């Protein structure tokens, strides 16, 4: 998912950087929007799958709920960091 996001951003950005004047500004905006949409969709799907697995694990073994919750929170933080990295890359493209 990260590779697809990076490929989409870089393929559109290279055309925009090679253009003269303001001809590529629209392409940079389009690339940033597509890149953030892909990252947000991937993170949403990943977080949903993680929450589903945590709920199933807690339902099967309620005594392990505390350990599962700690692991879930850590995993959700890692997944959310990918969206933040995509946002930083998109902001770098927009305010170059």
Swiss-Prot record:
Gene3D superfamilies: F1F0 ATP synthase subunit C (1.20.20.10). InterPro entries: ATP_synth_csu_bac/chlpt (IPR005953), ATP_synth_F0_csu (IPR000454), ATP_synth_F0_csu_DDCD_BS (IPR020537), ATP_synth_F0_csu_sf (IPR038662), ATPase_proteolipid_c-like_dom (IPR002379), F/V-ATP_Csub_sf (IPR035921). The chain crosses the membrane at residues 26-46, 68-88. It is a multi-pass membrane protein. PROSITE patterns: ATPASE_C (PS00605). It comes from the Bacteria. It is found in: Cell inner membrane. GO terms for molecular function: lipid binding; proton-transporting ATP synthase activity, rotational mechanism. Pfam families: ATP-synt_C. GO terms for cellular component: plasma membrane; proton-transporting ATP synthase complex; proton-transporting two-sector ATPase complex, proton-transporting domain. The record marks 80 as: Reversibly protonated during proton transport. Keywords: ATP synthesis, Cell inner membrane, Cell membrane, CF(0), Hydrogen ion transport, Ion transport, Lipid-binding, Membrane, Transmembrane, Transmembrane helix, Transport. F-type ATPases have 2 components, F(1) - the catalytic core - and F(0) - the membrane proton channel. F(1) has five subunits: alpha(3), beta(3), gamma(1), delta(1), epsilon(1). F(0) has three main subunits: a(1), b(2) and c(10-14). The alpha and beta chains form an alternating ring which encloses part of the gamma chain. F(1) is attached to F(0) by a central stalk formed by the gamma and epsilon chains, while a peripheral stalk is formed by the delta and b chains. F(1)F(0) ATP synthase produces ATP from ADP in the presence of a proton or sodium gradient. F-type ATPases consist of two structural domains, F(1) containing the extramembraneous catalytic core and F(0) containing the membrane proton channel, linked together by a central stalk and a peripheral stalk. During catalysis, ATP synthesis in the catalytic domain of F(1) is coupled via a rotary mechanism of the central stalk subunits to proton translocation. Key component of the F(0) channel; it plays a direct role in translocation across the membrane. A homomeric c-ring of between 10-14 subunits forms the central stalk rotor element with the F(1) delta and epsilon subunits. Belongs to the ATPase C chain family. This is ATP synthase subunit c. It comes from Oleidesulfovibrio alaskensis (strain ATCC BAA-1058 / DSM 17464 / G20) (Desulfovibrio alaskensis). The gene is atpE.
């Amino acid at each position: 998912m990260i590779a697809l996001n990076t490929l989409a951003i870089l393929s559109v950005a290279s055309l925009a950087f090679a253009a003269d004047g303001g001809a590529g500004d629209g392409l940079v905006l389009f690339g940033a929007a597509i890149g953030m949409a892909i990252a947000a969709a991937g993170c949403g799907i990943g977080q949903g799958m993680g929450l589903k697995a945590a709920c199933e694990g807690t339902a099967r073994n309620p005594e392990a709920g505390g350990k599962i919750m700690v692991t879930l929170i850590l995993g959700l933080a890692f997944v959310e960091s990918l969206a933040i990295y995509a946002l930083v890359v998109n902001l770098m493209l927009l305010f170059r």
